[in-house]
């Protein structure tokens, strides 16, 4: 009975696809009436359909697996990571397990005022990648090859190569590396915008070092954001089994095309519970193409600080529904200021496309090339206004790079982070995401979870402002005013230059 029920369910959903060779019941040419098959014929047909879908998955696995590689990243000699301390601030256990990546674990495992991170030697980082050209370009996650000393790549046939880094983009957690080889099997990208909830999804990777593991699931959701994994989020959610070691591997459609790059999971134990996230192929390809051609990513810049719209704000600003993004600040001299955008404008559409979320708008602007003209539809004092803006290149992050050299990673403080930290939503400062053990920052006592309030005696409330201050401090020590809870202190980061 269970077998028959399974067959019926499958035959009324998946197997109506012409790709799988399903044919509807035949009609009598003289009467036009559908002729029902006997029960034995129906059962035989259903078994054939099950075999057909099995062959479909097998075909994808056979064709795609040779293009998937096993990556081992051996960090630089002496490189250390900060062990994640216990959760002491009343937070719920962080559900996002970033494939044993200390950077992400530290993001939520914040130390208490009295705790200092305990340095420990880093082990090799192991993950997955996939080949995108016959001459050896390989895509993976940034966190798989971060702080790389030596990168080993093992092909499906067992051949091993040493890889070099071509380009890194931590803002999307993507990276491109290259091996010296020719005539390699490679994967092609599909269109992630065409995905529908319930479509098949196939993940290939190396979970726990078990190479060439294939798992199958469906697309559970699209457009997942505000997960605080990376700066630019538009994740595909899938229930295809993804575990530590799958990071950087491909998520495929039933045609064997890459529709996403597997990046993170939700887990209370570190293992699979049915919720995984992949970077959509359209976003990934834009980044990957630039990394291959230029070694870096150029992003569009509007020059506004945004806040998500909730039901209360929607009512306050007289929106007909909950959508759009609220401008809380306009950067001086930015394209937004020059175009006439104001604080408290609500951006509800760009180039005629409705703004579903703050993240969707940020992603769209960032993917625009400098010089692109975009028409923004805003709500101002209850009225709709269209404002054309020409985006420019996002300002060089010299300041952030200088800070990273001193061992600190930062990001803008968002309302969501404020909520997790128990801070007021209008708190100003820059959030310390991670600190490299043994770095000048670690020696000075900077720890993840602190807020940077001022740099060289100048108040800062955004990464853009931090950049401006640090651009004028090249080669000099940096004085930071940092806070953690109610404790404020000053620390000096010593420059190596």
Curated annotation (Swiss-Prot):
Keywords: Hydrolase, Periplasm, Protease, Repeat, Serine protease, Signal, Stress response. It is an enzyme of class 3 (hydrolase). GO terms for biological process: proteolysis. It is found in: Periplasm. The active site is at 143 (charge relay system), 173 (charge relay system), 247 (charge relay system). Residues 290-381, 394-485 form the PDZ domain. InterPro entries: PDZ, PDZ_6, PDZ_sf, Pept_S1C_Do, Peptidase_S1_PA, Peptidase_S1C. GO terms for molecular function: serine-type endopeptidase activity. The keyword Transcription regulation does not apply. GO terms for cellular component: outer membrane-bounded periplasmic space. Substrate binds at residues 245-247, 302-306. Residues 128-289 are annotated as: Serine protease. Its main location: periplasm. SMART domains: PDZ. CDD domains: cpPDZ1_DegP-like. It catalyses: Acts on substrates that are at least partially unfolded. The cleavage site P1 residue is normally between a pair of hydrophobic residues, such as Val-|-Val. The keyword Ubl conjugation does not apply. PROSITE patterns: PDZ. Residues 1-16 form the signal peptide. Its EC number is 3.4.21.107. Belongs to the peptidase S1C family. Might be efficient in the degradation of transiently denatured and unfolded proteins which accumulate in the periplasm following stress conditions. This is Probable periplasmic serine endoprotease DegP-like. It comes from Chlamydia muridarum (strain MoPn / Nigg).
């Amino acid at each position: 009975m269970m077998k028959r029920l399974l067959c019926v369910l499958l035959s009324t959903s998946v197997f109506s696809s012409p790709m799988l060779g399903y044919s509807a019941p035949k009609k009598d040419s003289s009467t036009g009436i559908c002729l029902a098959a006997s029960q034995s014929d129906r059962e035989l047909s259903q078994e054939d359909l099950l075999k057909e879908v099995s062959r479909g998955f097998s075909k994808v696995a056979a064709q795609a697996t040779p293009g998937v590689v096993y990556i081992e990243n051996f960090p630089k000699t002496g490189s250390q990571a900060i062990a994640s301390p216990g959760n002491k601030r009343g937070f719920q256990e962080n559900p996002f397990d970033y494939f044993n990546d200390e950077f992400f674990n530290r993001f939520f495992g914040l130390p208490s005022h009295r705790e200092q991170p305990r340095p420990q030697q880093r082990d090799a980082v192991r993950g997955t990648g996939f080949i995108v050209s016959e001459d050896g370009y390989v895509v993976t996650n940034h966190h798989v090859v971060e702080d790389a000393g030596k990168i080993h790549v093992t092909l499906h046939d067992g051949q091993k190569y040493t890889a070099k880094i071509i380009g890194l983009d931590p803002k999307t957690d993507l990276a491109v590396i290259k091996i010296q080889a020719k005539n390699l099997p490679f994967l092609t990208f599909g269109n992630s915008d065409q995905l529908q909830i319930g479509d098949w999804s196939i993940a290939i990777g190396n979970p726990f070092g078990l190479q060439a593991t294939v798992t199958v699931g469906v697309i559970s959701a699209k457009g997942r954001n505000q997960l605080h994994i990376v700066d630019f989020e538009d994740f595909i959610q899938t229930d295809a089994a993804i575990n530590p070691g799958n990071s950087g591997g491909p998520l495929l459609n039933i045609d064997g095309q890459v529709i996403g790059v597997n990046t993170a999971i939700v887990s209370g134990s570190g293992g699979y519970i049915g919720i995984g996230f992949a970077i959509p192929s359209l976003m990934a390809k834009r980044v990957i193409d630039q990394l291959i051609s230029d070694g870096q990513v150029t992003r569009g810049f509007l020059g506004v600080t945004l806040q998500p719209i909730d039901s209360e704000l929607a009512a306050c600003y007289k929106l007909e529904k909950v959508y759009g993004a609220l401008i809380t600040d306009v950067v001086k001299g930015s394209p937004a200021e020059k175009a006439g955008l104001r604080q408290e404008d609500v951006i509800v559409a760009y180039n005629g496309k409705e703004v579903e979320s703050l993240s969707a708008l940020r992603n769209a602007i960032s993917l625009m090339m400098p010089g692109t003209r975009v028409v923004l539809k805003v709500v101002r004092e209850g009225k709709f206004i269209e404002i054309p803006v020409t985006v420019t290149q996002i300002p060089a992050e010299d300041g952030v790079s200088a800070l990273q050299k001193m061992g600190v990673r930062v990001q803008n403080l968002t309302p969501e982070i404020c909520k997790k930290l128990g801070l007021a939503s209008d708190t100003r400062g820059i959030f310390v995401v991670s600190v490299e053990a043994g770095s000048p920052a670690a020696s000075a006592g900077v720890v993840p979870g602190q807020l940077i309030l001022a740099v060289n005696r100048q108040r800062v409330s955004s990464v853009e402002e931090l950049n401006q201050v640090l651009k004028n401090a090249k080669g000099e020590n940096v004085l930071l005013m940092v806070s953690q809870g109610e404790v404020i202190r000053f620390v000096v980061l010593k420059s190596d230059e």
